[in-house]
Amino acid sequence: RRLQLLEEVAEKANDYSGQIFTYQLDVQDADQCKVIAEKFIAEANGISCAIANAGTGGDDGLFSGTSSQINNVLNTNIIGVTNSLMPFIPKMKEQKNGTLVCISSVASYVPLPFHGGYASSKIAIRMIFDSWRPSLQKYSIKTVSICPGFIDTPIVKGPARSFPMVSADKAAKKFIRIIRGGKKTYVYPRYYLFLIFLVRVLPERIFNFIMKKMFHRPIN
C-alpha cells in the first residue's frame, strides 16, 4: 500500500540490472491481486519467482469484545498470501518452472500469549505450502517457507524491540540464498531452532508457566 516507499526502492534499484515494476494494491482484495499479477506477467513476459511478503502484526485484542484486530491479522497474513500467489500459479504451470515464497515466522512454532492470530496465520501459510508442494513439484514449481525471528523492520514495535534482532539488510541477503538454495522450510536465525526444540519437549504446564512469566502483556 505504501507507494512512495515502493518508488524509493525502485529508484535505488535502478543502479542494478533489470527492469523495475511498482504497483499499489491491497492484498486482502483478490480481484486487485489478480489484475496486478496478470499485468506483471504481461509486462515482464512471465514470472520466475513470487514472494508473498506483505503482512501485519499486532495482538488479538483479546479483551476488546470485538474480533476486528485478530480478523485483520488473519485476513492479511493468510488470505493476503493466497491472493498474492495463486494468480501466478497457472503461468508457472504453463512455463513448467517457478518459485513461490511465503514469509512465515518462528511464531508458527511457538504459541505466544496475546498473539494467537499472528502465530496461527503463520502456521496456516506454512501448512498451505506443505500441502501445495507435492502437487506443484511435478510442474517444477518450488515452494519455500521462510520462518524468521525478530527482524529489525517497522512491523516490530513496543516491547518486541527488546528482543535480539537481525538487520533487514542481513536478513534479505540470507533470504535470497535460502530461495536460490531451494530450501523447503527454513528457520532464521538458526538459534531459534533451540527454542522450537524446547517447545516440543517441555511439559505443557511448565511451558505455559514460562510463557505467562515472560509475556504478561502483548509484545507488539
Map each language-model feature to its residues.
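Rossmann-fold cofactor-recognition segment
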Residues: 13-31
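Conserved NAD(P)H cofactor-binding loop of Rossmann-fold oxidoreductase domains
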Residues: 53-58
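Substrate-binding pocket helix/loop in short-chain dehydrogenase/reductase
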Residues: 61-74
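Active-site loop immediately N-terminal to the catalytic Tyr-X3-Lys motif
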Residues: 63, 112-116
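Active-site helix of classical SDR
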Residues: 85, 121
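Residue(s) in the substrate-gating loop at a strand-loop-helix junction
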Residues: 105
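C-terminal helical subdomain
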Residues: 145, 160-196
